[in-house]
């Protein structure tokens, strides 16, 4: 395992957005009688938020971003970089981060790129972005992480459909020489 220690970067805030629509696991058409109850008892997951009616991951990211920068009172032109981490990209080309940069009216000088990762994505995105920021050339950045997993798996999938919902998050990072070190332990199994 690789231990990465990053200095001079602070987490200033985190905002999350989930879609309004709720899917009940008891109602999934894939289960035979009694199966849904067993899955719910084992996983403790009765329901999850899912996208419908054209809601996209970008929409969830945008709402999380607007709430976050409003609470932090950050001006858009002070954001130097954004990174989007997901397996649910809506675009192959251009990068989703570049599309989001335009949608959020961020500066054309704002560095924007994607990282394709699933479960460890937020940690990998945090370690990558904070490492870039630690020298002080990037003062403020936003890490977007999220999935619209229900668009990728079938309602007839017994393995993943009952487990994963949809959400988008925005995490604000800022260069700060007095910040507590961030530590990341990386490995792959």
Enumerate the language-model features and the residues they cover.
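Condensing-enzyme catalytic core mediating Claisen C-C bond formation in acyl metabolism
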Residues: 1-54, 157-189
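Phosphate/pyrophosphate-binding loops at sites that engage ATP/ADP/AMP, CoA/4′-phosphopantetheine
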Residues: 64-80
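Flexible, glycine-rich active-site loops centered on histidine and acidic residues
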Residues: 134-167
